[in-house]
Design a protein with these regions (language model features):
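Iron-sulfur-associated redox domains of electron-transfer enzymes in respiratory
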Residues: 1-206
């Protein structure tokens, strides 16, 4: 979550070194595309405003070239008279854990699943900071050395990315719709899914 990372940088700079070096899914996908097609221009479209600040952060090489909100792409399509119609789509690319990334707790669940699949029987405690207020509280506890959990999953928007400021649906309705789609996901594991990609061609770290 770029909003969470920005919060750390601005208000808790002493915790900068504790932030994961893993880049965001937006950046990871952009790097993967550019590894295959160096001349590609990548555009992220979603409900997140903080992605715009991440795009202009020159320290993140290979990131998306542009970030647009749903409001912006909707306005562009309306101006051009484009009307989207629902289509049947049975194609799936991400694992169910990847599909849950947009929900609060989704990233933490993926980390725990990775440990499980890799045979690392580690009992880790996760602080799922849902929304800016919980993020601030968790970071303050960490700063004081009083955070009881092992790591923080920080989501600046309530409910996770689905609660972003450019979301057109009510948060509960958006989560309900996403949960319905997630139920249709197959049962492939994370590592099995990652085997479909040439991970040696790009880096997932800052």
């Amino acid at each position: 979550c770029p909003g969470f990372v920005n919060m750390v940088r601005k208000h808790y700079p002493e915790l900068n070194d504790a932030v994961s070096t893993t880049v965001s899914p937006m950046c990871g996908v952009s790097r993967m595309i550019k590894a295959k097609d160096p001349g590609a221009v990548t555009v992220f479209i979603g409900p997140c405003l903080a992605k715009k600040s991440e795009v202009v952060d020159q320290k993140i090489e290979g990131n998306a070239d542009y970030a647009m909100t749903y409001s912006e792409i909707r306005a562009m399509m309306r101006a051009k008279g484009v009307a989207l119609e629902p289509v049947e789509n049975t194609y799936q690319e991400a694992s169910v854990f990847g599909k849950r990334f947009g929900n609060s707790g989704g990233v933490a669940a993926a980390v725990q699943e990775c440990l499980k699949e890799s045979g690392n029987d580690i009992d880790i405690k996760v602080c799922k900071a849902n929304g800016a207020a919980e993020c601030k509280k968790a970071l303050l506890l960490m700063k004081l050395g009083k955070l009881p959990e092992d790591f923080i999953e920080g989501m600046a928007c309530d409910g996770g990315c689905v609660g972003g400021p450019s979301s057109f649906k009510d948060q509960k309705l958006a989560k309900k719709s996403r949960d319905a789609l997630i139920k249709e996901a197959d049962d492939r594991g994370i590592y099995k899914n990652l085997s479909n990609y040439d991970e040696d061609s790009f880096s997932m770290h800052r």
